[in-house]
Amino acid sequence: MASSHQQQQEQDQSALDLITQHLLTDFPSLDTFASTIHHCTTSTLSQRKPPLATIAVPTTAPVVQENDQRHYRGVRRRPWGKYAAEIRDPNKKGVRVWLGTFDTAMEAARGYDKAAFKLRGSKAILNFPLEAGKHEDLGDNKKTISLKAKRKRQVTEDESQLISRKAVKREEAQVQADACPLTPSSWKGFWDGADSKDMGIFSVPLLSPCPSLGHSQLVVT
């Protein structure tokens, strides 16, 4: 470090000496003086300027999503971008059962898992083992809630119909009590009552001839 500093001072001193010599004495030619000055200045600047360090920029590889590269069991990608799910039914000699078309591979994989768990139970090989049975339980809960709501609605409708029928029967009974129509049965009861001692309107005694006309009075016993 000290030697380079000393060398730089010597070069600066030599440049000053050349300038002084040019001012006080004459050089053989102006070109010789210019070339000497250029050599001194360039050598001085090259020593002062530190070398540039080359920095290597790392190249980043394109990020590829794991979901696009992973192959799920029972899932196939269609040419138009959708994902189809299917499963082999052991009860039908391994016949493929179509499960539907999904927008993403994960949805199709979950559809396969649901069908596989329903067919094979705990022995099924699933894409998402930690989610085994969750979708099935959720579906059962929804069905149970739907059935309860349906039963409650049916009971309410039955009660409403029963109340309406009772109200209609009451109204019919009231109308019959207010105005009893003349029917053959009612006339039959009327005539049957005429044979009794209390004959209603027919209980009036027979009229005898008027005595003022000279007829004797008839008494009916």
From Swiss-Prot:
Function: Probably acts as a transcriptional activator. Binds to the GCC-box pathogenesis-related promoter element. May be involved in the regulation of gene expression by stress factors and by components of stress signal transduction pathways.
Molecular function GO labels: DNA-binding transcription factor activity; transcription cis-regulatory region binding
CDD domains (alphabetical): AP2 (cd00018)
Predominant location category: nucleus
Subcellular location: Nucleus
Disulfide bonds: none
A Pfam family hit: AP2
Keyword Transcription regulation: yes
Keyword terms of this UniProt record: Activator, DNA-binding, Ethylene signaling pathway, Nucleus, Transcription, Transcription regulation
Gene name of the record: ERF105
Biological process, per Gene Ontology: ethylene-activated signaling pathway; response to heat
Keyword Cell wall biogenesis/degradation part of the UniProt annotation: no
Protein name: Ethylene-responsive transcription factor ERF105
Family of the protein in this entry: Belongs to the AP2/ERF transcription factor family. ERF subfamily.
